[in-house]
Structures are given as structure tokens and as C-alpha cells.
Amino acid sequence: MARGKAKEEGSWKKFIWNSEKKEFLGRTGGSWFKILLFYVIFYGCLAGIFIGTIQVMLLTISELKPTYQDRVAPPGLTQIPQIQKTEISFRPNDPKSYEAYVLNIIRFLEKYKDSAQKDDMIFEDCGSMPSEPKERGEFNHERGERKVCRFKLDWLGNCSGLNDESYGYKEGKPCIIIKLNRVLGFKPKPPKNESLETYPLTMKYNPNVLPVQCTGKRDEDKDKVGNIEYFGMGGFYGFPLQYYPYYGKLLQPKYLQPLLAVQFTNLTLDTEIRIECKAYGENIGYSEKDRFQGRFDVKIEVKS
């Protein structure tokens, strides 16, 4: 039995290294060299094919603009302050209850201060009244970075923070800032005047403004919203078109989206009110799957 065990032990040792045939794990040095060379060439070819296909694909893709945008959804509409549960609840006499909302607005509007828009090599004045979309050439590097339109904070009126650092929250008249999300090359198409059946009479129509309207989401909310004031360029309730199209972070790294400020001046107290804000346009779509596509809703409660 000891002899059988020794024979078995010698057998696997001989398989690992056979000194008579100069074999390691059953192969000679030449055999190992050939098989390793085969796998190096094989995987090298696979890597070459992979890298080649990636390079060909990259040649068809522009770093400045997506090649295919036919499935890009219309831009979303969002509000500042940005909050996780889309709920704004506060007491006007308790600064701590609305401090987070105010700080969120302050941080967002930092880049809209006059001091941040001084560089004439980057920024330009595009007028104080809405006008047509401002084309800035093709999406390429030939002209370098493109200028962006300045946006003045004082256009936001009571919600600019210039005269009221609490943005209305201290008085129980909260402000929200509305923006249209960025989409490369997107040019909003405002609706025709006659197509806006629900357009409030107080809102001035302008063919160069993408209008926005905020109302009570549900029937029971409509009577509780009270008066709504809008502050935007030229006194219009929407986004002026000269800020479009957007050319992307590489060509317009300092781009400023046009803003619309909305202030709710007499909300019913101690009541959770659901408010929907909606942009209107021929190329603005809405989706039940995405509640921020072209619109958003927010719950606001002013506690006594």
C-alpha cells in the first residue's frame, strides 16, 4: 500500500515537471510558446476589432451636438427652490422654516448677478424685450465659444432678491423661479394667439415668448390659490426666444437660461394647495410618465 501511494505521488509530480521529456504540465517549452503566441495574437485581433469599431463609431459622433435627436423628449419645466418632495411648507414668522428655500434660491441666482456677467467676451446684451431666436452659427469649433445673452435680475421684480432677501416668504407671499431645462439646439415654438383658449386676459401675448401659466391643480385648489404675479423680461409671462437655441457646455459654458418668477400673494392659510405650472408651445409635450415634461406641480402650505 505504501508502494502504491508513492507511485501515485510520483505520478502527479511527474505530470507537473517531467525531467525526462522536459515537459511542464504536459507541454514542452516550444509547445507553451506556440499556444501563448496563439492567444496573444487571437486576443490582440479581438482588441483591434473592438478598438476599430469604437473609432469608426466616434467618427460619426459630434462632441458638440448629438447626431440623432429624433427621440429626445421636449424639455422639462422645473422650479427653484428645488425640493425632494415638491412640497413647500413654512410659517412666515419662523425664519428657520423657510431658510432652506431661500438659500436654495440665493445659490441658484448667484450666476445671474450683474457681477457674474461683466465679461463682454462672453456675455452680450440681447435687449430688454423678447425677440426672435438668436442663431450663432453651426455646431463646430470654427468660431470658438459663442456669446450668451445677459439676463438681468431686476426683471424678476419682487422675486429678484434685490429688495426682499426673503423672496416673499417672510410675508407669506412665496416666490418660485421657473426655468425650462436645456436641450441642445432646441428652439421653442410659442402657440398661436388664437389657439390659447385658456390664456388669461391679464397675460400679454407675444409671438417671441413661450408662455407659462400656474393654476390650481385640482378643482378644490383653484379658489385657494388667490392672486398670482408673474415677473419676466418685458413683463411677459414666459421665456423670451432670443436665449435659444442652446449650443451646449463646450460652446456656451456660461449660458444663462431665461427665467420666470412667480409669486403667490394671498394663498389660503393652513391649507395644502397643489399648484401646476405649465409651458405652452407647439413643440412642448406632456407625459403622464414624466410629470416634469413641459410642466410641474408643487404643493405649497403657508401656516399661520
Curated annotation (Swiss-Prot):
Q: Which protein family is it in?
A: Belongs to the X(+)/potassium ATPases subunit beta family.
Q: List the InterPro entries hit by this protein, alphabetically.
A: Na/K_ATPase_sub_beta, Na/K_ATPase_sub_beta_sf
Gene that encodes the chain:
Atp1b1
Asked if Oxidoreductase is a keyword of the record, the answer is no
Q: Name one Pfam family in it.
A: Na_K-ATPase
Map out region (immunoglobulin-like) in residue numbers. Answer: 191-304
Q: Which residues are glycosylated?
A: N158, N193, N266
- For this chain, the annotated S-S bridges are C126-C149, C159-C175, C214-C277
Modified residue Phosphoserine is at which positions? Answer: S11
Higher taxonomy: Eukaryota, Metazoa, Chordata, Craniata, Vertebrata
Species annotation: Rattus norvegicus
* Phosphotyrosine, modified sites: Y101
> By what name is this protein known?
Sodium/potassium-transporting ATPase subunit beta-1
Say which domain of life the source belongs to: Eukaryota
Keyword annotations from UniProtKB, A to Z: Cell adhesion, Cell membrane, Disulfide bond, Glutathionylation, Glycoprotein, Immunity, Innate immunity, Ion transport, Membrane, Phosphoprotein, Potassium, Potassium transport, Signal-anchor, Sodium, Sodium transport, Sodium/potassium transport, Transmembrane, Transmembrane helix, Transport
Q: Per the record, what ranges lie on the membrane's Cytoplasmic side? A: 1-34
